[in-house]
Amino acid sequence: MCMGKGFVLNEVFDRLHTALEVVESIEGIEFATSKKYGYVTSCPSNLGTGMRASVHLKIPNLTADGTDTAAKAAAKPLGLSVRGTGGEHTPIGADGTVDISPSNRLFITEAEIVTKLYNGIKLLLEKEQAAASSGGGGGGGGGGGGGGGGEAKGCCAVS
């Protein structure tokens, strides 16, 4: 796993790639792979590249009701998953911080995963701003300015 403070997906991805090249160069070490499915992992959702990229994102307006329901509704059409910062089935942060990652990691490249996450987060932040200008909550639509909230917080991780 590689992590970085701030919204530095490319830097984190580059560090992970370099580390994996070193590991793969060690004599006798191989990763389990399938010609059909790519890298084989202990978690079926990580089949393919074996990589999960995520960003902790503060979206207080889409989580104003204390749940991730509106955030998930806004993220799903963007191809993103929302979960608590402690992993699957954990609650969102009290300040509206959630973990965002691409839903699909099978049959796409590592670069496509990072690009999908980056572009999806930009659109999700627009929905967060729209929710801020409409008084919080709800899925929000398009752009819009107004009331604050919505920032890449803490770190991004690629594993």
Question: What is each residue range found by the language model?
Answer:
Residues 13-20, 71-72, 121:
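A generic alpha-helix structural signal
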Residues 138-144:
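Long, acidic low-complexity intrinsically disordered regions
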Residues 1, 34-138, 150, 154-159:
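A structural signal for small-residue-enriched, beta-sheet-centric alpha/beta enzyme cores
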Residues 15-41:
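Short, hydrophobic/aliphatic alpha-helical segments
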Residues 1-19:
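Active-site acidic/histidine clusters and adjacent loop/turn architecture
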